[in-house]
Amino acid sequence: MAIINPHINFNGNAEEAFTFYKSVFGGAFTNVIRLKDLAGPEFPVPTEDENKIMHIALPIGGNLLLGNDVPASLGKVNENENRSKIAISAASKEEADKLFNGLSAGGSVEFPIGDSPWGSYFGMFRDKYGIEWMVDFIPGK
């Protein structure tokens, strides 16, 4: 079966956001590549973009959360649009609460975590970096 690895574009704060995500999920980055690491005649990198993230990966369970900073030359990511929504299926109600509370810190809750009409324990929020998340736990699954 295919594995889905969400990828998020950032406006220069990918490293900060991923450090925050790592503080909630734990683990270690498997790969961090900066734009300056790829600089060369065929790929010139402006000085202001040298330390931006070209690629970062954080293993979570059997998947990877991937991200990068968008170089200034490509324009800004519209952070008010729904760039993505990441769904997390928790293994327990306690894990769902931990992830929901940890990731939503400093963000805005759109749907407080709790028992949903469809039978799962569910919550939805936008984190302090503008990324939308859904957390659910399905009892008996």
Language-model features: locations:
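Short, small/polar residue-rich loop motifs at catalytic or cofactor-binding pockets
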Residues: 52, 117-120
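Glyoxalase I/VOC metalloenzyme domain signal
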Residues: 1-111, 124-141
